[in-house]
Design a protein with these regions (language model features):
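Single conserved hydrophobic/aromatic residue that forms the stacking wall/gate
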Residues: 246-253
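Residues that define the transmembrane beta-barrel architecture of outer-membrane proteins
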Residues: 41, 66-70, 122-126, 147, ...
Length: 253
């Protein structure tokens, strides 16, 4: 009888099985997808300096080089997404040009050869801009990217500090070339253009019906904490289940 019980026990052991389940999880992360940041995240401050050239009604009377003057810009803004931001910028300093009218506003000095006069006046241009980070829009978010190109468009107004004081509406556009130095600091090369109402330089007329300024500046941007964007959890897109059945070896009696 003992032999019979041993045989039954061996048969039961042979029928036992162990199931091992293996899961294969494939996770992907959308390089364009980030979590919307709080209001006080991703603010920045920028300052820069460089040179500008004025294009007024009669500025072609003098050489281009003599219309170049110093300029500066100070900006504060926020990135709402890696590809879209807003900023407020104060720019300007001094504009230089020429006129044939001795009685025109902002004339400085005596008559020059060919019958024209120098113009010079101090001004500011306060404008709001919408910025588009093309690298983030087309290549996805990458906080360690060294170079990014950021075009912008905006509108504002000018104010001439020199007398007679004058205000004019302005539209603005440009390109920011951003070079990352650290998590907090960038170097910027900004190329900008402004078109203002024709009265900006104190004269009305000419071929275009507006006055313009082109400028190039080099500056620094500081990004306040909290900076950067967080990504959502990776998504589970597939799951494979594999089962392996292990039978115990049959015991001989």
């Amino acid at each position: 009888m003992l032999l019979a019980l041993a045989g039954l026990s061996s048969a039961a052991m042979a029928q036992q099985k162990t199931e091992v389940v293996e899961y294969e999880i494939i996770q992907v992360q959308d390089k364009y997808q980030v979590i919307t940041n709080p209001f006080w995240s991703n603010w920045f401050f920028s300052i820069g300096g460089g040179a500008e050239a004025t294009f007024g009604d009669n500025d072609s009377a003098g050489s281009f080089g003599k219309r170049i003057s110093p300029t500066l810009n100070i900006s504060v803004g926020k990135w709402f997404t890696p590809g879209l931001g807003l900023r407020l910028q104060y720019s300007g300093l001094q504009a230089r040009g020429f006129t044939y009218d001795k009685g025109a506003d902002y004339v400085k000095g005596a008559e020059l050869k060919d019958g024209y006069y120098k113009q010079r006046f101090d001004y500011m241009n306060l404008h709001g801009d919408v910025m588009f980070n093309l690298n983030a829009l087309f290549g996805g978010y990458n906080q360690h990217r060294v170079y990014e190109i950021i075009p912008y468009v905006g509108a504002g107004f000018t104010h001439n500090y020199s007398k007679p004081h004058r205000e004019a509406l302005s539209v603005n556009a440009g390109i920011i070339n951003k070079f990352r130095i650290s998590n907090a600091v960038d170097i910027n090369l900004e190329l900008s253009a402004m078109a203002a109402e024709d009265k900006f330089d104190g004269e009305v007329g000419g071929d275009h019906g507006y006055d313009g300024v082109l400028s190039a500046t080099v500056g620094l941007t500081y990004r306040f904490p909290a900076r950067g964007f967080r990504r959502p959890m990776p998504q589970l897109i597939s799951q494979d289940r594999k089962s392996t059945r292990l039978n115990s070896s049959h015991c001989s009696t």
